[in-house]
Amino acid sequence: MTTCPVCGAANEELAVVCTSCKGFMRAKVDTLDLFHTMWGLFEAPTATFRRIALSRIKNYTIPLSCCLGIAIAFMLFWNANLGVAIPQLTTLIGLGILTGPFLGLAVVTLLALWAKWLLRRMDRKIAFRNAFAVLAYAAVPVVISLVIVFPLEIAVFGIYFFDKNPPPIVLNPVAFIILVGIDAIAAGWSVVLSGIGMRALAGLSRLRSGILALSFAAGIGGLFLIPLR
């Protein structure tokens, strides 16, 4: 809950106007600047997520979700060694680019619905579009990794990044450990950001927001149990 600085009344976490005295408690936000918001996620994530939730227009949430889906698709391909079944690199990359956006939108939608349902059980009401936006922007580290690290992985390993004969770690162990390590750090930071975002959105404790973030990670991790070949 948020306390009104004028009359002291308790209001919802992200309320702009006090329900008691009708005074403004915080400035309205119309739109989001992508690069300013991305930087804010690293510099001041809690304040940035509040700004995202308060924004009237949730800019870039759909493109970010689609890019997240593409990154997940390529991670699934790598985990399943799909290069064995599809030896053409261009075909494999095209498949990820085509299917990834649908996967990303589905994942973010389901996680937002899960967050809304679970928080309702905790007597915390959040809007679906706010949960969707927070989760989409929490994926920024993964999206950055997709844009910067994934092309390097393809440049170094080619189709063998998705193969096991030989596995990429055998071809260039140092490059593999560094690049995949950066991917892992990006994924972990996105999980942390999702917890910070939910805390900013619903006023959760660190323990509850951490548990919720781990449930998001577990949900996405469950995708890796699906056999792709």
Regions found by a protein language model. Give the residues of each.
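Juxtamembrane "helix exit" motif at the C-terminal ends of alpha-helical transmembrane segments
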Residues: 69-86, 158, 222-227
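Hydrophobic, aromatic-rich alpha-helical transmembrane segments
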Residues: 57, 85, 89-101, 105, ...
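Hydrophobic alpha-helical transmembrane segments of integral membrane proteins
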Residues: 41-42, 59, 98, 137, ...
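Hydrophobic alpha-helical transmembrane segments and adjacent short intramembrane/lumenal linkers
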Residues: 115-116, 120-229
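N-terminal juxtamembrane cytosolic/stromal segments of multi-pass membrane proteins
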Residues: 1-81
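Membrane-interface interhelical loops and short amphipathic "cap" helices
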Residues: 80-96, 159-171
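Alpha-helical transmembrane segments and their immediate interhelical/interface regions
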Residues: 15, 19-34, 92-116
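Hydrophobic alpha-helical segments of integral membrane proteins
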Residues: 34-52, 101, 114, 118, ...
